[in-house]
Amino acid sequence: MERYEVLEQIGKGSFGSALLVRHKQERKKYVLKKIRLARQSDRARRSAHQEMELISTVRNPFVVEYKDSWVEKGCYVCIVIGYCQGGDMTDTIKRACGVHFPEEKLCQWLVQLLMALDYLHSNHILHRDVKCSNIFLTKEQDIRLGDFGLAKILTSDDLTSSVVGTPSYMCPELLADIPYGSKSDIWSLGCCMYEMAAHKPPFKASDVQTLITKIHKLIMDPIPAMYSGSFRGLIKSMLRKNPELRPSANELLNHPHLQPYISMVYMKLESPRRSTFPLQFSERDATLKERRRSSFSNDRRLNPSVSDTEAGSVSSSGKASPTPMFNGRKVSEVTVGVVREEIVPQRQEEAKKQSGAARTPRVAGTSAKASTQRTVFKHELMKVSNPTERRRRVSLPLVVENPYTYESDITALCSLNSPDVSVNTPRFDKIAEFPEDIFQNQNRETASRREVARHSFSSPPCPPHGEDNSNGSITKDKCTVQKRSVSEVKQRRFDTSSYQQRAEALEGLLEFSAKLLQQERYDELGVLLKPFGAERVSSRETAIWLTKSFKEASV
């Protein structure tokens, strides 16, 4: 527990509480789930320990990330899992205020949930509590299935008979006290998809007996007609009364209606877009990444058809995520070829026309669609490009000799078009809400103008022949150049050890912060004050210098 800093309590229930914590070294937010053991039944204690052991073995991109777990003083089971900023699906439906989600979004969520359930069922794990409040969303609106408190590892007969779960999501065989298996999770998923589409649960009643009757007789309102017949048919197939007639997660993933969305989900898995650079690297991680890249390059040279997934690509967090499987094959083997046949010719023509532009590294301004297509067709782009130029993966922003060393990432940071500040400070140049006049002089200055400015500052211009320049007056243009050079020299000569200059800069920082606060621009204010942490390197001097530059540039 000493490795984490408690931020706030985000949930509380009869068995424990959920706390938002921050890892002190990683500076990353997690959720600490504390399950109380005192004054609980033996079954509840066993369930808590089982959840801790079970979730530590689960590794899937669409299941909540497991970080750590321990038993605290014999009174609490503590489980640290990944924090999903998007909240749960129940809150997402409430925030929609009756506005239906697009079918494309629902299909993407369905595919991600099916991949999570297929992974669990293939490992003989029953979730047994699939409901909207246990489906979480990341900041990018991706699914994470959580809460394994009622999960169970199946026995050899693949059936269980315990009556657990939420009544509104219980399958008919469970209510009839008939042994059930993985098809019970499919029923619960069908109820969730119905609720996502209709913004209300399929079976709802004021008392339990009426609810059971509605479930047994399948009494529910029709799914909104705005969705296609194929999509509505998928949901209805998951809500069949006979479990033998319900499709499995593997069979649903092979449905023709979901194939395009499987391709989209897999391409997003294969090439995650990174918006930040890691500030710290360990030598061990760098060595492993370098070996993996070297092995992957050798495999691709021997066999150009080798995909990133077969070579074992990793996400930006550094942990390998298992490739979703269905029908005995990897998703890449089933779907990527279909998309490639449709739009390869168009991409090859564009690559030939823009071969020069493709070699220029781009950091911002690319759309998600372009980034995704570039990921799928990186093999084709390599064929039409110059064979002598160095190749790079699209998830990296720059072409470097050794992409996985600490020095190369510093080189990538230095080559970005950003203010001359420490790499530990926030990226002010990426904040679109700042006024344009702050960076106007810096972006428009060229090397020739800087040279003229330096000369004009070091040696005053000679007066024209026949004119008396004893009063020191110069033309308007020359005065402007001289003013720029003075500001530039002041920025270069700013001494952080000077108390007077530090006081002036701090005063400017307070004025600038007060201005942001008055305009209710809290995001920019938070980014401006973020460098003042004790763990940063020269953060105060860097922030003072940067604020003084802003103040002088706005004069």
UniProtKB/Swiss-Prot annotation:
The active site is at residue 129. One of its GO terms (molecular function) is protein serine/threonine kinase activity. Its EC number is 2.7.11.1. Residues 304-320 have a biased composition (Polar residues). It catalyses: L-seryl-[protein] + ATP = O-phospho-L-seryl-[protein] + ADP + H(+); L-threonyl-[protein] + ATP = O-phospho-L-threonyl-[protein] + ADP + H(+). ATP binds at residues 10-18, 33. This is Serine/threonine-protein kinase Nek4. Pfam families: Pkinase. Residues 288-328, 346-372, 443-477 are annotated as: Disordered. Residues 4-258 form the Protein kinase domain. Belongs to the protein kinase superfamily. NEK Ser/Thr protein kinase family. NIMA subfamily. May be involved in plant development processes. InterPro entries: Kinase-like_dom_sf (IPR011009), NEK_Ser/Thr_kinase (IPR050660), Prot_kinase_dom (IPR000719), Protein_kinase_ATP_BS (IPR017441), Ser/Thr_kinase_AS (IPR008271). Keywords: ATP-binding, Kinase, Nucleotide-binding, Serine/threonine-protein kinase, Transferase.
